[in-house]
C-alpha cells in the first residue's frame, strides 16, 4: 500500500478499547459506542452508560485496488475512505449518508445505512467481506477475510450490519468496492404517485443502469449510473427530461435533508412489495 492510500490520521486504539471494556465489565456498566456521533438519534432510549469513544481508532489498514478490497478501522470517517478510493477510480458500492463528514465506517455498518442505491447496488451488508471485533468478554475475534471469494464458515461478519454494536465493538471492516460509474444523470417525469409506482416497476425490470428512483413533488426521478454508452442509450429509449441538478437531489435524499424529512408531521416508513398499493386508515382519535 502506497502513501497515497493513507489518510492523514491513522492509529490503532484496539488495546485502549479492550481496557475500557474490561473496566465496564468490572462495574457491570452498559457501554455506548461512539465514533462520529452522527447516529445518536437511532440508538433508542437513554440509560446510565459508559461512553466508549472509538473515533481515534482510525486509518486504512490495507487497500489493494486490483483486488477491489479495502480494509479500514471502524473509526475511520467515510469521507477518508471515499477519497482514497476516488484516487484509484473506485467507489463504495453502496451509498451511505456522510452526515457532514463525521459518519464513520463502523457506525455505518452497525446501523446498516446504505442510501438510495440500495435496491440496485445492494447494502453495506452485502459488501462486507470480514470484520475484526472485540466481544463482551474482551476477546478479539476475526470473522470472514479480505478476499472476495471467501467461503470459510458461517458469514458472521454480515450479522454486524444493523446490530447497533450489540454483538461487539467493531475494530476493522473489510469491504468489496467497485469501479466508479463512468457517467451519472437523472431523468424526471411529471406523473402522479400511482403512475410513478407502475413506471418504476416497469423500468426496474429492464437490464438498464438504474441506480435510484424517487417520486417527489409530482415528479418521478430516475437515476442512471454506469458506462457512458449504456447511460446514453437508456436516455434515448426512456426519454424524459434530464435534471441538471440531479446530484444535489440524490445528495439531499442520501443525507436525509429533503424538506419532508423535517416536516412537523409523523414520517412513516413501510417496507412492502414495490407493486403493492398502500392504504392508510388510522381510524378516529
Describe the predicted segments one by one.
Residues 42, 81, 142, 231-233:
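Short helix/loop capping segments that flank catalytic or ligand/cofactor-binding pockets
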Residues 40-46:
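Short glycine-biased active-site loop of nucleotidyltransferases that positions the nucleotide triphosphate
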Residues 33-39:
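Glycine-rich beta-strand-to-loop/alpha-helix junction loops that act as flexible
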Residues 2-33, 54-100, 113-145, 181-191:
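N-terminal glycine-rich flavin-associated loop
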Residues 94-95, 101-213, 219-220:
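FAD-binding subdomain of flavoenzyme oxidoreductases
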Residues 197-285:
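C-terminal substrate-recognition/cap domain of FAD-linked oxidoreductases
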Residues 47-52:
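Short, well-ordered secondary-structure micro-motifs within conserved domains or adaptor modules
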Residues 39-40, 111:
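Transmembrane alpha-helical segments of multi-pass membrane transport proteins and ion-pumping complexes
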Amino acid at each position: 500500500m502506497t502513501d497515497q492510500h493513507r489518510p492523514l490520521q491513522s492509529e490503532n486504539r484496539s488495546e485502549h478499547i479492550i481496557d475500557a471494556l474490561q473496566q465496564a465489565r468490572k462495574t457491570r456498566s452498559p457501554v455506548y459506542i461512539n465514533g462520529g456521533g452522527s447516529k445518536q438519534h437511532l440508538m433508542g432510549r437513554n440509560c446510565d452508560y459508559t461512553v466508549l469513544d472509538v473515533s481515534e481508532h482510525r486509518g486504512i489498514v490495507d487497500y489493494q485496488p486490483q483486488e477491489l478490497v479495502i480494509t479500514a478501522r471502524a473509526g475511520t470517517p467515510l469521507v477518508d475512505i471515499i477519497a482514497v478510493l476516488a484516487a484509484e477510480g473506485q467507489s463504495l458500492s453502496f451509498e451511505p449518508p456522510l452526515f457532514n463528514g463525521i459518519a464513520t465506517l463502523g457506525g455505518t455498518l452497525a446501523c446498516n445505512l446504505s442510501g438510495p442505491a440500495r435496491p440496485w447496488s445492494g447494502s453495506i451488508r452485502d459488501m462486507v467481506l470480514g470484520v475484526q471485533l472485540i466481544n463482551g468478554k474482551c476477546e478479539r475475534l476475526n470473522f470472514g477475510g479480505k478476499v472476495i471469494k471467501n467461503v470459510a464458515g458461517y458469514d458472521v461478519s454480515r450479522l454486524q450490519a444493523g446490530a447497533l454494536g450489540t454483538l461487539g465493538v467493531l475494530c476493522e471492516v473489510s469491504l468489496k468496492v467497485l469501479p466508479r460509474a463512468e457517467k451519472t444523470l437523472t431523468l424526471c417525469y411529471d406523473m402522479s404517485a400511482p403512475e410513478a409506482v407502475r413506471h418504476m416497476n416497469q423500468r426496474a425490470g429492464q437490464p438498464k443502469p438504474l441506480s435510484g428512483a424517487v417520486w417527489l413533488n409530482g415528479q418521478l426521478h430516475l437515476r442512471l449510473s454506469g458506462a457512458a454508452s449504456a447511460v446514453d442509450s437508456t436516455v434515448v429509449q426512456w426519454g424524459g427530461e434530464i435534471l441538471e441538478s440531479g446530484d444535489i437531489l440524490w445528495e439531499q435524499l442520501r443525507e436525509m435533508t429533503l424538506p419532508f424529512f423535517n416536516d412537523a408531521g409523523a414520517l412513516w416508513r413501510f417496507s412492502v412489495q414495490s407493486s403493492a398499493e398502500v392504504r392508510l386508515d388510522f381510524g378516529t382519535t
